[in-house]
Amino acid sequence: RNSTRLLLPLALAAPAARAAVLSEDRADVLYRRYEGGGVTVDGPSLLVRKKFAEKYSVSANVYVDMVSSASIDVVTTASPYEEERTQLSLGTDMLNGKTQYSVNFTNSDESDYTANAASLDISQDLFGDLTNLSFGFARSWDEVRKNGDREFSESIDRWTYRLGLSKSVMSRLMTGFNFEVITDEGFLNNPYRSVRYVDPDSAAGFAFQPEVYPNTRTSSAAALNARYFLPYRAAVHGEYRYFTDTWGIDANTVELGYTHPWGKQWIFELTYRWYDQSAADFYADLFPRRDAQNFLARDKELSTFTSHMVGVGATYELPPLAWDFIKRSSVSFFYDRFRFDYDDFRDITAGGVPGEEPLYGFDADVFRLFVSGWF
């Protein structure tokens, strides 16, 4: 169940290196909705940023998720459920010459999971501001619980290290490199999820037992990106990302995008992303027997699968408002369409001979609506 805390884990990457410039004073109101695979997640978010003395900046964010899940994992081994997650974040930035220091803290809480994270990032402009180097680390400590079992309580400790480099190669071309390493230790599997194994004594031909994961995991990701600005204020961008971990997963991501301004008030965006990964060493859709090996997983996100995403978006800068304290404002809408196809995860709800059921796949939609104001 806790996997719903991350709507789009495939899209996550190390933060890009950024110039040592404080963000503008602004407020953003967001509504986001995800629908796909029997899961619906939606909720609002509010983010406010404010500068002080041109050297300091603070930010605060609140986000609320409403989750309704009847995913294939849930309907085959449990019951559909609904829950709410609340996330609070606080951050501060300090600018000292060409160096920016950023400290952030995030708390997320739901009925069976509490997550806390603190991070420090440093960004430095070099070589006449044409190059930016950034590095940082984050520490997370989570508590995993299980609804219906008050005695169940496990922990997860996580360390994240990241490095970023961006460079202006020429007046129209920006390039970047990001590298990230994450180490996890603790209870890393889902307490609700089960694996299935061949059971001749069962009418279905198989039975279930709880998943068992290793209690450690180290993953690393490297990404190369580039953005080229066209003469008519448009831009094209591309990124390649490689991911690998100690569980045997290797993944590749390719993203291409185009941004096009229209007039003085409109900006349109088009994005395509392709993702492909191999399965974890201890994953199987159907194990030959109970306790077939030390570690057991049937989470489809640890299987071999491919996804495609096509996204479109538009931003409209609003005319001046009657409120003098708002310098400018805009409205943005983004829509992403995902397709997931699994190579070794089968849809057991379709019936059939165990291990020969149809392969699973589903479509998902993500909607995002922003209202932003600068003051």
Name these PLM-found stretches.
Residues N61-G91, L130-N189, R193-S194, T218, ...:
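Outer-membrane beta-barrel translocator/channel fold
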Residues K50, T92-N96, Q124, K167, ...:
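Residue-level signature of outer-membrane beta-barrel architecture
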Residues I122, R172, V312-Y316, F362-F375:
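Outer-membrane beta-barrel "beta-signal"
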Residues Y31-E35, V64-S68, N96-K98, N107-S111, ...:
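Transmembrane beta-strands of outer-membrane beta-barrel pores
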Residues T40-P44, E82-L88, L95, T114-A118, ...:
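Residues that define the transmembrane beta-barrel architecture of outer-membrane proteins
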Residues Y31-Y34, V74-S79, N104-S108, S119-D121, ...:
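Extracellular loop and loop/strand-boundary signature of outer-membrane beta-barrel proteins
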Residues D25-V29, V58-A60, Y101-V103, T131-F135, ...:
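Transmembrane beta-strands of outer-membrane beta-barrel proteins
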